């Protein structure tokens, strides 16, 4: 009887888990479905609601959407690539020093870095804005890139330092005996072994920068260097009155770079390419 009761409870528990997963999947898929449907409908079909399938899908809306935001997407990609590279490079170098060297005040400095993680980012916006003005980089791409690199250091240092500390110390001892410098060990040992965590941090930084709306709105007014998230709202307001399907298509097109970058990053994990770092 006990085994039978446990079996029933197990089946019941699995059923609840499956139902919850289905609900979560639907909650994730529904906004995407609504956006796709509206992006393919004519104005008359748009008024009828979301559930009716489009009789004549308006695929040319996607061409119009891309033409509207392509320059802004390029601006976003440039900012995201430079910021991501800066965050990964400088934070990994700092983490290497914290994980491989002992020096006076090391623990205090690392505790200070960790304390900065507790500070809400909104509290640093005003000081960052004043620094941008003092540096004379307001309304330039550097107003996006430099604060992005500085703001992304704290979490990245913590992540990299935790990972670097777990790397075999024997590799570094052998390299030191062979006369390898810190720079050599950093590029030839530490980074190749840390490719998975480097990719994780790069994807996170890229996504945060690409989706950022508030900070670019504060520091960039020049139309030629605005990011895609800045432009979406203004362009959507202009076209929504005439062809609302184009505005929905823009939302979908703007997400394509994030999807492609994520797929490229996941490729390393699926193919096991990160294991190549073990071949020293």
Task: Briefly describe each language-model feature range.
Residues 4-9, 13-280:
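A structural signal for multi-pass alpha-helical bundles of membrane permease subunits
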């Amino acid at each position: 009887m006990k085994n039978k009761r446990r079996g029933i409870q197990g089946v019941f528990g699995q059923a609840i888990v499956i139902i919850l997963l289905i609900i979560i999947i639907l909650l994730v898929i529904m906004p995407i479905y609504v956006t796709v449907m509206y992006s393919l409908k004519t104005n008359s079909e748009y008024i009828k609601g979301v559930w009716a399938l489009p009789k004549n899908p308006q695929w040319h809306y996607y061409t119009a959407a891309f033409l509207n935001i392509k320059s802004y997407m390029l601006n976003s990609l440039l900012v995201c690539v430079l910021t991501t590279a800066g965050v990964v490079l400088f934070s990994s170098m700092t983490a290497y020093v914290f994980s491989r060297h002992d020096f006076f005040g090391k623990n205090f400095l690392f505790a200070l870095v960790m304390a900065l993680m507790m500070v809400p980012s909104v509290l640093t916006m005003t000081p960052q804005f004043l620094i941008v003005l003092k540096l004379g980089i307001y309304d330039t791409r550097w107003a996006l890139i430099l604060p992005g690199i500085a703001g992304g250091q704290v979490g990245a240092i913590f992540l990299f330092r935790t990972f670097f500390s777990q790397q075999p110390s024997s590799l570094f001892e052998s390299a030191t005996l062979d006369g390898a410098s810190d720079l050599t060990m950093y590029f030839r040992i530490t980074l190749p072994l840390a490719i998975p965590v480097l990719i994780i941090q790069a994807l996170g930084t890229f996504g945060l920068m690409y989706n950022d709306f508030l900070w670019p709105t504060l520091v960039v007014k020049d139309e030629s260097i605005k990011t895609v998230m800045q432009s979406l709202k203004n362009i959507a307001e202009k076209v929504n009155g005439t062809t609302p399907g184009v505005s929905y298509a823009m939302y979908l097109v703007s997400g394509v770079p994030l999807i492609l970058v994520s797929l490229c990053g996941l490729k390393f994990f699926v193919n096991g390419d990160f294991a190549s770092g073990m071949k020293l």
